[in-house]
Amino acid sequence: MSKSKVTSRTIRQGFTLAALIAGSIAATSGAVAGECPAGKMQPNVRPMVDHKAIGVTDVTLGAINLEKQPASIKDRELRFRKLTIEPGGIVPWHSHDDRPALIFVQQGEIVEYASNCSEPIVHKAGEIRPEVAGTSHWWKNLGKDTVILYVGDVRKDPHDHNM
C-alpha cells in the first residue's frame, strides 16, 4: 500500500482494529505494563547487544504522512504494525529516542531488556507499554506460545526498519 494513497477502506480497517484493541484493554481491567522494579533503574545499566531479529514477523497495517494532516508535523509518519514473535524469537536492540511508540501485548508474554533497568521486565497479554525518549531495549519471547504485539509509532525516517 502506498503511503500517499490511504483509502477510506484502510482508514476504516485501522479504526476497527483500534476499537478491537481498546476493547481488549478495557476487558483486562486497565492492566498496566510491566515496569522496572523499584531501585533497579539506572542510566545505561544494560549495554547494547547485537542480536539479529529471530522468529519475528513485522507487518505494517497502515501509515499516515503527518505532514499532510492538519497537525502538519514535518517529516513524520504515524505507523501501525503487528509484530508476531515465535517462541525463542528476538526483537533486536533499538532506540525510541526519536520514535515514540505504544506497544499493546495482544497475546502471550514477552521479556524486555531495557538499557535503563538492571532486571528484565515481563510484559503480559492485555498490557500497554509506552516507549519514549530514553528507551533503548530488546525483547525476547521466552515462552512456549507465540506473542502478538500491536505497535503504534511516530517515525521520522520511512527507511528506518528498526523494530
Functional labels for PLM-detected ranges:
Residues 75-80, 97-98, 134, 144:
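Extracytoplasmic
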Residues 85-86, 114-134:
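Short acidic-glycine-tyrosine-enriched beta hairpin
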Residues 98-117:
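Glycine- and acidic-residue-biased ligand/ion/polar-headgroup-sensing regions
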Residues 2-6, 10-14, 24, 30-79, ...:
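A short, N-terminal "cap"/entry segment at the start of jelly-roll beta-barrel domains
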Residues 124, 133-160:
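Ligand-binding loop in jelly-roll beta-barrel domains
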Residues 91, 109-113, 128:
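Short beta-strand segments in beta-sandwich/barrel cores
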Residues 72-76, 89-102:
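A short beta-loop-beta micro-motif enriched in histidine and acidic residues
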